[in-house]
């Protein structure tokens, strides 16, 4: 889709789903993966798209999500190691979905 990643780390699964909805409705981005930590009390969303869409999506989620993100960022043209890390997380995410 694109060659940039946007990251949002936000407290709670419900707030994360709200942030993802905002990001996907705001710009042409897709969910690459997500990670739940601390029993779901902290959720990291990773979206993918071109740099302008990812930036717009992350900014919109930070401004309008149910809860304030703990952290956020955009990586334009991420290093190959970052891509590998996101792809590894995405493969675990897809495997869990296939088991359900």
Regions found by a protein language model. Name each.
Residues 27-30, 61-70:
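A common structural junction motif
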Residues 1-11:
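Short glycine-/aliphatic-rich beta-strand segments at the starts of folded cytosolic domains
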Residues 36-39:
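A short beta-turn/loop motif at secondary-structure boundaries
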Residues 81-100:
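Short, low-order "capping/linker" segments at domain edges
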Residues 13-28:
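Short amphipathic alpha-helix segments
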Residues 72-82:
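Metallocofactor- and cofactor-centric catalytic cores in central/energy metabolism, strongly enriched
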Residues 48-54:
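Helix N-cap motif at beta-to-alpha junctions
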